[in-house]
Amino acid sequence: MKKKIIVALILTAVCLTAVLGAAACSNTELVGFDIELANAVGEDLGVSVEFAQINWNTKENELESKNVDLLWNGMTITPEREAMWEISEPYMLNEQVAIIRKADESKFDTKDKMLSSDKWAAESGSAGAELIGDLGATLIGVNAQISVLTELNSGSADIGVMDSVMANYYINESGSTYSSSLMVSPVKIATEEEYYGIAARGGEVALMDKINTSLAKLWADGTISDIAEKYGLSDVVLPIEYTSQWDSITDKSSWDYIAARGKIIIGYTLFAPIAYEVEAA
């Protein structure tokens, strides 16, 4: 019998179109790069995968209280998170980008002009929100990255900051809701690239070694590349190579606990093309 992995999905409270993803909608199917990758890892580890919901703003509490076992949601690897948690090998490249209204392209064609505005929007607690703080700009915090785009369209914000992976999907996809009114600014606001990783509680090395070993196997056999191509992410997915160090850990209790319990809980947010819902066939 397969064991069960529960992947916690942090969903927004509104239903969106199939292009934008959806949450709490009837007759929908959960799809996306991370969703398919999690399913592939589950199959490789001999466990089934189930998706549940948490609040991303309380992800630290959810992880430390053992409501979830992994955070796996296009999560940016940071030194603070590496010090606090066990972090997987990076599996995707990302950067923070500025989103503006097309009508404001000339108004905000330099970083200095952007910084003249006191209306910058980003998801609270995100890498984008942190960057806005680093720039000395005034943050309008929203509860999900997708809400950054609605703030811009409504005029409540002048500049939005979000992951390039998500921005390219929502804005550059032909026919998407925001492609006619918004644009990814060519102005660079971030000095460094970012990397996505998966987090486990600090000390749970054996569990993370299992995840890393599976990811390396799925890279080697082409599974990750196939999933990336499906979601238009071939140019940002990163290779993961196996290292024997992942088999050298003697304390395997964190994985043994999961295996004995028969399920693992992972935190997600609604984040196309990483995780989103479409109408079920």
Task: Give residue ranges: language-model regions.
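Bilobed "Venus flytrap"/periplasmic-binding protein-like clamshell domains
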Residues: T28-E43, M75, L93-L149, S164-N168, ...
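Alpha-to-beta junction loops
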Residues: G46-S48, E64-N73, D118-K119, N153-A167, ...
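Periplasmic-binding protein-like
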Residues: M92-I100, G175-N212, S234-T250
